Amino acid sequence: MSKVLVLKSSILATSSQSNQLADFFVEQWQAAHAGDQITVRDLAAQPIPVLDGELVGALRPSGTALTPRQQEALALSDELIAELQANDVIVIAAPMYNFNIPTQLKNYFDMIARAGVTFRYTEKGPEGLVTGKRAIILTSRGGIHKDTPTDLVVPYLRLFLGFIGITDVEFVFAEGIAYGPEVATKAQADAKTLLAQVVAA
């Protein structure tokens, strides 16, 4: 039995193309892998706090007593990392907002990037500690950006996930959704076709 973590990050709730792909993934995965356990975390509905000067002190051990707010942040970070480590397949619904990922997803990454916990520094350079995972990225975009300099989402996600140890990463794209209903419908249908193949693989 595999455990699957689905992370949603769109601010558009049920109107979101990436959230619709995430829901489709869950349906397809449950049908193909009935015994697997799926956890869905909506980072927009349950937002992660923005890392600031106070909260960063909670994630970097210094021996100083933590404030109540820092204690809450550290407990949340521990919870998120434990959840990440406990799952085998990590599905990230990552729409493109202004050429990059949503703030909600960046806040999540800031809360799980902890030296000595999800990565460590060695004489040979940084080493990721979140290993043995498969990541599937569902990314929707208003325009056409795949394989162009305007796509900052793919290289960033590959870099960050690889940094913490997740190197098995595949992408499913839904592009051109702002070009009109017909284009959006086709983009969603094409993405679902590919996603069904990914689930079956």
Curated annotation (Swiss-Prot):
Write the record's keywords in alphabetical order, separated by commas. Flavoprotein, FMN, NAD, Oxidoreductase
- Which residues are recorded as binding FMN? 10, 16-18, 96-99, 140-143
- What detail does the entry give on cofactor binding? Binds 1 FMN per subunit.
> Which principal EC class is assigned to this enzyme?
oxidoreductase
Give the classification, highest ranks.
Bacteria, Pseudomonadati, Pseudomonadota, Gammaproteobacteria, Enterobacterales
Q: What is this protein called?
A: FMN-dependent NADH:quinone oxidoreductase
Gene field: azoR
Q: Which domain of life is it from?
A: Bacteria
- EC numbers for this chain: 1.6.5.-, 1.7.1.17
The subunit structure is: Homodimer.
Could you say which protein family the record assigns here? Belongs to the azoreductase type 1 family.
User: Which coenzyme or cofactor does it need?
Assistant: FMN
Question: What is this protein's function per UniProt?
Answer: Quinone reductase that provides resistance to thiol-specific stress caused by electrophilic quinones.
What reaction is this protein's catalytic activity?
2 a quinone + NADH + H(+) = 2 a 1,4-benzosemiquinone + NAD(+); N,N-dimethyl-1,4-phenylenediamine + anthranilate + 2 NAD(+) = 2-(4-dimethylaminophenyl)diazenylbenzoate + 2 NADH + 2 H(+)
